[in-house]
Each structure stands twice: as C-alpha cells, then as structure tokens.
Amino acid sequence: MTPASALVDQRSRPLRVLRLSLTARCNLACPYCCPDLEDPPDLLSLEQQLRLIRVACRLGIHSLRLTGGEPLLSARLLPLLQAIAAARATPGDPLQGLQQVALTTNGTLLSDQRACDLRQAGLDRITVSLDGVDGAVVARMAGRPTATAGDSLARKVLGGLASARSAGFDPLAGELKLNAVIQRGVNEDQLLPLADLARDQGVELRLIEYMDVGNRNQWRLDQVLSAAEMVTRIRARWPLQAVGRPTGGTAQRWRYVDGGGHLGVIASISEPFCGDCNRLRVTADGQAFRCLFASVGTDLKPALHCEAELLRLVADLWRRRDDRYSDERQQTTGSMPHAEMAYLGG
C-alpha cells in the first residue's frame, strides 16, 4: 500500500480531514441548510463507522469532525466517541494518529450533562452555530415563526456554550468556537453584535459566507456578503491584525489588537481555498463526497464489510480527485445540481 504521506489527489492535495455526518435530521429549519425531516435509509452501523474512520486514519487523516444535520440527535454519537477514544488509547491502532475529534452543533441540545458526557467520551472540540443575536433575525435564520421563539433559541445556544465551557472545553485552546453564516440583506446587521458577543464570551467567532450548497435554498451570488466586507465592518469597530490561513485550513484568522481574542472568516465564495483542500465528506448513509459542492457521491457501503477493500476504494477515490468547484464557480453555477447541506454535513 502506498504510504499515507504519499496519498495525494490529481492536484497533489493530501487527505487529512474526514467529516462524517451522523444524521441528516435537525431540530431547526435554517433556510440556507434545508435539513431533512427523516434520515436516509441504511444508516451506517457503529461498526461500519469505526471501520471507515480506521481506514481514513491509515490513509493519512489526523482530524475527524462529526456533523449532521444535528449530530446530538444521533443516539450513536456517544457510543461512537467512546469507541474512538478506546482505539486512540490502544497501542498500534491506526486511530492513535488521530490528533483531534471535533463536533459541529447548533447548541440547542447541549445541556450541562450532555456536554460533560461528550467531554468524558473523548471529544476534543465543539463548534456551536448561531447566526444572530436579535430574536427576529435568529428566528428568520433558524426557520422559527416569531422573534420570541428566536430569543428563546438564542438563549438555548448561549446556554449550550456555557455548558461546553463548564465541561472543560477551553476557548483559549481552540476547543470551543462560534460559527455564523452571514447572508446579505438577511442578517448582515448582526455582524457587530455577534462579534461583541463572541468577545464577551471569550470564544473565536468564525463568519461564513453564504454558500451555494444544495438546491433548496435558491442561492444567488448577490446574497453573499464577502469575507472582505465582513472584516472591513468589524475592523472599523475593533482594529484587527491579520494572522492568516494555515495550509489546509478554511478560516482566514485575525487577531483583535486590543487583546479581545481572534476572528475567523471562511471565504469559500470570494476567496476559494480549493488549492489545498484536504477534506473528505461521508454522509450518514455512506456516500463519500470529495467536494462540498459536488453533485454525486460514491457509495462506500459495498466495501464496508472488508477493511482492505474499503482501503482500496477510498484510496482510489482520493487519487482520482480533481475537484475545484469554487475555483470554477462562475462557469458551473446553475448548470449542475448539488447535494444538500444537511445531507453532506457541511
């Protein structure tokens, strides 16, 4: 087998990150994500998930992110984390090379007990999503009917942040972050309130450009507020110093000059990072996608019964990878369908 360090795609990009979705379901209805009401049939079993993670580690991944939908809706989350932790502690197991296990959640189900359970089960990092501070805006971004419902939702998310911090997820160590999708004309007025909130909470805020993932959200380019515009607006209130984007990373990071922490911006529309993208996405039912903006995936289930066969399939899939959709967006937008965000797991 080719050494993991030599496994690269057609553009010399290594495989380093696995994003594994546990469910396509969500308890919110964010219009940019459009989650499913039910999971697809034939969800991967715990054994299949572990086999996939083990193979991915053998092929070079060092980071695993568990996503959804809302992953806290999955009854398999804790058993999976516990099994991963046991493997990471076993001499000679490929999962010993796993440097971090992270989770993306909307935070509404992140109680004190849940956060403690996740930490004790071996979770290293949590990213919580909140797209505004004002109740009416939060309601609009989360598919809730009223501003009162939006206020209630925001309180739950902030409670989830507090629970994660109490459970030992340290923002200063990058173990707890806040994500926000920004859509021009919808929640762009929440930039400063969100930044103020994150500074007050001591967590890094990561602002995400509104992306053309899926077909249900009726995305248009004029709805995108660019990362540069976001930074300009925040910098006018709090001076910023550029930190940069690490190779293979998604966020361009900035440091508040006054010591108020860090800010990240993910500019997949205005400043694509296809050139060093190192992520493989696998859905809850075992479809592998080499690009967030892909239209079709590769079904891994026929190979999931045998680790050697799965290793060959994933390695071949990655070697043949030539995706750079964001770089080619102007030529391809509108001409091909995309898999939905909640199905892909972001």
Curated annotation (Swiss-Prot):
One of its GO terms (molecular function) is GTP binding. InterPro entries: Aldolase_TIM, MoaA, MoaA_twitch, MoCo_biosynth_MoaA/MoaC, rSAM. The keyword Transferase does not apply. S-adenosyl-L-methionine binds at Y32, G69, S129, M211. GTP binds at R19, R65, T104, K177, R279, L280, R281. It is an enzyme of class 4 (lyase). Residues 10-240 form the Radical SAM core domain. Its cofactor is [4Fe-4S] cluster. One of its GO terms (biological process) is Mo-molybdopterin cofactor biosynthetic process. It catalyses: GTP + AH2 + S-adenosyl-L-methionine = (8S)-3',8-cyclo-7,8-dihydroguanosine 5'-triphosphate + 5'-deoxyadenosine + L-methionine + A + H(+). [4Fe-4S] cluster 2 binds at C274, C277, C291. [4Fe-4S] cluster 1 binds at C26, C30, C33. Its EC number is 4.1.99.22. Pathway: Cofactor biosynthesis; molybdopterin biosynthesis. Coiled coil: none annotated. The keyword Ribonucleoprotein does not apply. SUPFAM superfamilies: Radical SAM enzymes. Residues 326-346 are annotated as: Disordered. Binds 2 [4Fe-4S] clusters. Binds 1 [4Fe-4S] cluster coordinated with 3 cysteines and an exchangeable S-adenosyl-L-methionine and 1 [4Fe-4S] cluster coordinated with 3 cysteines and the GTP-derived substrate. It holds the Pfam family Mob_synth_C. Catalyzes the cyclization of GTP to (8S)-3',8-cyclo-7,8-dihydroguanosine 5'-triphosphate. Monomer and homodimer. HAMAP family: MoaA_B. Belongs to the radical SAM superfamily. MoaA family. This is GTP 3',8-cyclase. The gene is moaA.
